[in-house]
Design a protein with these regions (language model features):
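Hydrophobic membrane-insertion alpha-helices, especially the h-region
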Residues: 1-13
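Compositionally biased, intrinsically disordered/low-complexity regions enriched for serine, proline
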Residues: 13-14, 30, 153
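Aromatic-capped interface at the extracytoplasmic side
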Residues: 14-24
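Active-site beta->alpha N-cap acidic-glycine motif
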Residues: 22-111, 115, 120-122, 130, ...
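His/Asp/Glu-enriched short active-site or ligand-binding loop at hydrolase and phosphoryl-transfer sites
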Residues: 130, 140, 145-168
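Short, Asp-centered acidic motifs that coordinate Mg2+ and/or phosphate
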Residues: 133
Length: 168
């Protein structure tokens, strides 16, 4: 149903305030995004990537409201540009909004910084809030991409369970 809209990712990254999360963890010298957070509570974070279409979004929002489920929507710059009213609707419904950022190795650090800034500014302007969560659209990242997000005051977030619905 929602495969056209976005692919859902369930990942544990929300935690009670007493848990400290580190976005700068590294494994063998590679910086890692937040994929989960240690907590004694049984919680999952339901996330959606919004990239191309807004098909089924109203139905999704109705289901989330009916079930009293909070989600985080990671939106690309193009999606935010094409569906600004819907972005505001999602935000006003109490869901978190994060940036869905595409990194490209062919771009210079300055060009990557500009794409991240453009994405952040568009979301911030439309939602009248500060964007601090970022996800890599294709799941690919490197140390410089993680560093750019951290230097902007943001947190890189990925998934740890992939629904694979994008294959349908």
């Amino acid at each position: 149903l929602l495969g056209v809209l976005a692919f859902a990712r369930a990942c544990i990254f929300l935690a009670p305030p007493s848990v400290t999360t580190l976005a700068s963890a590294s494994v063998n010298g590679t910086f890692m995004p937040i994929c989960r957070v240690e907590t004694d509570q049984k919680k999952v974070a339901l996330t959606f990537n919004c990239t191309y279409s807004a098909q089924d979004m109203q139905q999704l929002l109705e289901i989330l409201k009916e079930k009293n489920v909070h989600a985080t929507f990671f939106v690309s710059d193009a999606w935010a540009k094409n569906y600004p009213e819907l972005l505001c609707t999602i935000h006003n419904a109490g869901h978190d909004i994060g940036g869905l950022w595409t990194t490209q190795a062919s771009l210079s650090i300055r060009e990557q910084t500009l794409t991240l800034e453009n994405l952040t500014q568009r979301i911030d302007r439309l939602t009248d809030s500060e964007t601090t969560l970022f996800r890599f659209e294709d799941g690919n990242y490197d140390n410089s991409a993680i560093r750019l997000i951290q230097e902007s005051g943001g947190y890189p977030v990925q998934w740890n369970i992939n629904s694979m619905d994008w294959k349908d």
